[in-house]
Amino acid sequence: MSCLEPLKKQKLLVIQSKIHSMKYSTTEFLKTATNTAEHFGFRKVEGFKNEPLCKNCSTTLSHTITPEDISQNTHNGLLSSYIATFCDNNLHALNAPVLLYSTEQIADTQDISIAFNIFNVQKSIAEAILIQMSRSLLQDLGHTDHTVRINSLGDNESATRYSRELANFLKKRLDSMSSNARESMKEHPLKALLELIKEDHDLSYRCPNPLEYLSDQSRKHFREIVEYLDMTETPYEIDPKMVNNFDCYSDALFSIEDKNFADNEASNLSIQGGRYDDFIFNKTKNRIPAVGTIITLKGINKPLTRIPRNKKSEPDVYVVQLGFGPKIRSLMIIDELRRAGIPVHHDLASDSLSAQIREAEARGVRYTIIVGQKEFIDQTVILRDMKERNQENIRPDQMLKKLKKQLALA
């Protein structure tokens, strides 16, 4: 992990999953994706419209996004669409984490796109949620053998410094570059790098490493994402050449690739994502933390006539955590509860134990699962019965059995 030594500031992730065969229908894909999203706490915009803070909001959040921006069949266009949805529906008034998902069919290609966005969460737990949810979705779709590739371009300060060094490096070697790469240099050095990577040019292996130019904040953020991967025993590799969609995203980038994928085969399923704090600032002139994942099912070639709706059951469990390690452990518990068919509430972005307990009480859940630093070290949880007002320290596997029995899910 020596390449982690020279890191530095913020969060840009890019997930790109290459899946070599589609073994499920469009309906199965959407049903699985929406079930997974809603378990992790994501809602459609309709689920926010009746929120009093949104309905009664008197302060609008203006933006410069046009219909032409949204119509672009690019990451730029898709992200613009999500920002417009956030602003136009007064979701900024919530002043709290907003986990939003949406489904659409791309007009030009008929591909099905489902997007997951997390607003108002600056911490790396937002990226961890998106990575974990994406991996869970892939596993549910039958793609269990995959690896995470990760990189970071850092925040604006980091990216500017890296772009300058990259430009200086390439300008000294223009004679050895192809005409396409030289032409791309006129627009942006990272665009030239993407062309060199596409050509598998020797320079693409010798270019400056973006991880060496990260600010302190970006280095810390990137390390936290890597810690999450280590703690969850997720196979991963650090790839400094992964600079996709640099014009949209900032900070940590990652991809998830099926190990069985052959380079000469077409991919049916694409998963791409990233943090776009700077992008949203350019559109709104407001500092709003934002991370998103776009999952696209390709090769549909027919209109989507029906988007399946899930039958929702009100969760009777709330997961409470305090601390970085407990957040990651809680994320894994939430995923285990998903596999067991137990719906759950959570606020993984919260750093207040009392606020989470109050929220659990307000929601009227029967059980809270509490993971603090002691429980994290001891590899236990506190299972609290909110009705009987008693609690016990218990191993996660025992907790799962008890919940299934008490909630009649065994």
Question: Can you annotate each of these PLM segments?
Answer:
Residues 2-410:
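TRNA-recognition modules of translation machinery and tRNA-sensing kinases, especially anticodon-binding
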